[in-house]
């Protein structure tokens, strides 16, 4: 149940290898299901990042996406049989906007390369629903949950706990240390 419109822009459009086209098709199917469930409050579109922008604006836009976690992948595509390969950039990500806030989803996060073999496609497709639902839940939440960690008795913060806090918890929760001394 969404109180306002959620706008989703997916950056999977244009001339791409078949693995990315399959990912785009799966993403569109999922977003169509979300639209049906969310009534008129889910809107989505597919676009080629920076299309129609001047070079400077396009570089600024791509830099903004990279800072949000959507990084371009440079891939080799065969132009025509016997003519060799051409390098292209593909940005497998989405930008979700809601009430003046925005968040980004890297559809290939967790993947080591942009080589779209069957295993990578299946893994990426399996995580699509979670990634979009999680991002929509985060961006539409009114408050961010708070976690407190008790410190005291001369104990130091272990590297495992520090890694957990920085790597996982800070992206989803507010975090505070509570001294018990």
Descriptions of predicted regions:
Residues 1-181:
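Short, surface-exposed patches at the edges or C-terminal ends of soluble domains, predominantly
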């Amino acid at each position: 149940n969404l109180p306002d419109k959620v706008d989703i822009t997916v950056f999977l459009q244009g001339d791409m290898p078949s693995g990315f086209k399959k990912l785009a098709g799966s993403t569109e199917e999922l977003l169509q299901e979300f639209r049906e469930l969310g009534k008129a409050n889910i809107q989505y579109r597919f676009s080629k990042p920076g299309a129609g922008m001047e070079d400077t604006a396009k570089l600024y836009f791509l830099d903004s996406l990279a800072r949000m976690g959507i990084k371009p992948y440079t891939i080799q595509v065969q132009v025509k049989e016997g003519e060799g390969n051409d390098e292209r950039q593909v940005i497998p990500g989405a930008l979700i906007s809601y009430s003046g806030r925005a968040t980004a989803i890297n559809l290939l996060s967790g993947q080591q390369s942009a080589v779209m073999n069957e295993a990578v496609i299946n893994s990426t497709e399996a995580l699509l629903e979670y990634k979009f639902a999680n991002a929509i839940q985060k961006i539409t939440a009114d408050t961010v949950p708070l976690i407190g960690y008790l410190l005291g008795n001369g104990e130091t913060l272990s590297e495992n706990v520090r890694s957990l806090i920085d790597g996982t918890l800070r992206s989803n929760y507010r975090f505070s240390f509570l001294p018990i001394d």
